[in-house]
Curated annotation (Swiss-Prot):
Prodomain positions: 1-10
Membership in a protein family: Belongs to the isocitrate lyase/PEP mutase superfamily. PEP mutase family.
PANTHER family referenced in this protein's UniProt entry, alphabetically: PHOSPHOENOLPYRUVATE CARBOXYLASE, PHOSPHOENOLPYRUVATE PHOSPHOMUTASE
Catalytic residues (positions): D66
Upper lineage: Eukaryota, Sar, Alveolata, Ciliophora, Intramacronucleata
One protein family per Pfam: PEP_mutase
Enzyme Commission identifier(s): 5.4.2.9
Keyword hit for Transport: no
InterPro entries, sorted: ICL/PEPM, PEnolPyrv_PMutase_core, Pyrv/PenolPyrv_kinase-like_dom, Pyrv_kinase-like_dom_sf
Gene that encodes it: PEPM
Function noted in UniProt: Formation of a carbon-phosphorus bond by converting phosphoenolpyruvate (PEP) to phosphonopyruvate (P-Pyr).
Protein name: Phosphoenolpyruvate phosphomutase
Gene Ontology biological-process entries: organic phosphonate biosynthetic process
Catalytic function, reaction form: phosphoenolpyruvate + H(+) = 3-phosphonopyruvate
Length: 300
């Protein structure tokens, strides 16, 4: 009964409002990575209430690096399929906004046209480099430049509930807590709806230190890819609002495809893989084949 009520609520509430409510809530929420329409459908069906449109995962699915090698129009096309296939909100990993304030505000306009609920922008220079690269030299944008980008995005959005998340890369660049707090406060004052505080340490000391000093000035989102052994109750205790499971569907696909391809290549047979892969009927179901059958009965 409760599950049906929640399903009805989420299907009738605007995606932007759904995402805003999740971010603003005192309860810790979780969103899961997807990188195309199929993975988005699986995330929604699993029960997640939101989707992370991962720049790394979308780029990887295209076979290119996470360095803005996929153009924003190519990313928008992927997002359109993801949005059409689901009723839950998508928060896009918008990198640096694909340029300056003008590129970023145009991105917001195009995202709203596709019913994307929000965008997360990071305070690095364009083109970006992935934050988890071992030898990646990270260059941060000047604070005033990124502040202007946030303001331009907020001024551009037509839906008041569209979310602009400011991702602070001070820890990633090795600039420390003081700089992280300085940037987060500037972005909050510029109108950012939430702060995504990123860290690539294997333990969460940087995030813990930030949360203690931040004192719930505005919602905080984290991405515990590297400090994944920390219990989520710890994040609740610190006052984190949202956790992003950022790239695991894409990585699961990579592992599964590598193993399946290797096995078929070595065996010259499907005998050992057929029991382990999804049935074709399951793929048809996820594609919505039943709806087409019903439509055929009605219109043909």
């Amino acid at each position: 009964m409760l599950a049906n009520s929640l399903k009805s609520f989420f299907s009738s509430t605007r995606k932007t409002t759904q995402l805003k409510n999740m971010i603003q809530s005192k309860d810790l929420s979780f969103i899961m990575e997807a990188h195309n329409g199929l993975s988005a459908a699986i995330v929604e069906e699993t029960g997640f209430k939101g989707i992370w449109g991962s720049g790394l995962s979308i780029s990887a699915a295209m076979g290119v690096r996470d360095s803005n090698e996929a153009s924003y129009t190519q990313v928008l096309e992927v997002l359109e399929f993801m949005s059409d296939r689901t009723k839950i909100p998508i928060l896009l990993d918008g990198d640096t906004g694909y340029g300056n304030y003008n590129n970023a505000r145009r991105l917001v306009k195009k995202l709203e046209q596709r019913s994307i609920a929000g965008v997360c922008l990071e305070d690095k220079i364009f083109p970006k480099r992935n934050s988890l690269l071992d030898d990646g030299r990270q260059e941060l944008a000047p604070i005033n430049e990124f502040v202007a980008k946030i303001k331009a995005c907020k001024d551009t959005q037509q839906d008041a509930d569209f979310q602009v998340v400011a991702r602070v890369e001070a820890f990633i660049a090795g600039w420390g807590l003081e700089e992280a707090l300085k940037r987060a406060e500037a972005y909050r004052n510029a109108g950012a709806d939430a702060i995504l505080m990123h860290s690539k340490l294997k333990e969460p000391s940087e995030i813990e230190a930030f949360m203690k000093e931040w004192k719930n000035r505005s919602p905080v989102i984290i991405v515990p890819t590297n400090y994944h052994t920390v219990p989520t109750d710890t994040f609740r205790k610190w006052g984190v609002n949202m956790v992003i499971w950022a790239n695991h569907n894409m990585r699961a696909c990579v592992s599964a495809m590598q193993e399946t391809s290797r096995r078929i290549y070595e065996d010259e047979s499907l005998v050992n893989v057929e029991p382990k892969v999804a049935k074709v009927k399951e793929v048809f179901r996820l594609q919505g084949e039943d709806e087409l059958k019903q439509a055929d009965k009605k219109y043909l």
